[in-house]
Amino acid sequence: MVDTTGRIPLWLVGTVAGILVIGLIGIFFYGSYSGLGSSL
């Protein structure tokens, strides 16, 4: 299968993107819960 992303598999891009999104959301909620969200 040949996709438009080149040598990088689409599922790998989706997985990395998902992990980054979950990580950012987790950091955001953790920061706001611990009182650091207002400074960010």
From Swiss-Prot:
A Pfam match: PsbJ
Membrane topology: Single-pass membrane protein
GO biological process, any: photosynthesis
Subcellular location: Plastid, Chloroplast thylakoid membrane
Keywords, alphabetical: Chloroplast, Membrane, Photosynthesis, Photosystem II, Plastid, Reaction center, Thylakoid, Transmembrane, Transmembrane helix
UniProt keyword NADP present: no
Disulphide connectivity of cysteines: none
Keyword Transmembrane helix part of the UniProt annotation: yes
Entry's transmembrane regions: 8-28
Gene Ontology, cellular component aspect: chloroplast thylakoid membrane; photosystem II reaction center
InterPro entries registered for this protein in UniProt: PSII_PsbJ (IPR002682), PSII_PsbJ_sf (IPR037267)
Oligomeric form and interacting partners: PSII is composed of 1 copy each of membrane proteins PsbA, PsbB, PsbC, PsbD, PsbE, PsbF, PsbH, PsbI, PsbJ, PsbK, PsbL, PsbM, PsbT, PsbX, PsbY, PsbZ, Psb30/Ycf12, at least 3 peripheral proteins of the oxygen-evolving complex and a large number of cofactors. It forms dimeric complexes.
Function description: One of the components of the core complex of photosystem II (PSII). PSII is a light-driven water:plastoquinone oxidoreductase that uses light energy to abstract electrons from H(2)O, generating O(2) and a proton gradient subsequently used for ATP formation. It consists of a core antenna complex that captures photons, and an electron transfer chain that converts photonic excitation into a charge separation.
Family from the record: Belongs to the PsbJ family.
Record protein name field: Photosystem II reaction center protein J
Native source species: Gnetum parvifolium
Taxonomic path: Eukaryota, Viridiplantae, Streptophyta, Embryophyta, Tracheophyta
Protein's gene: psbJ
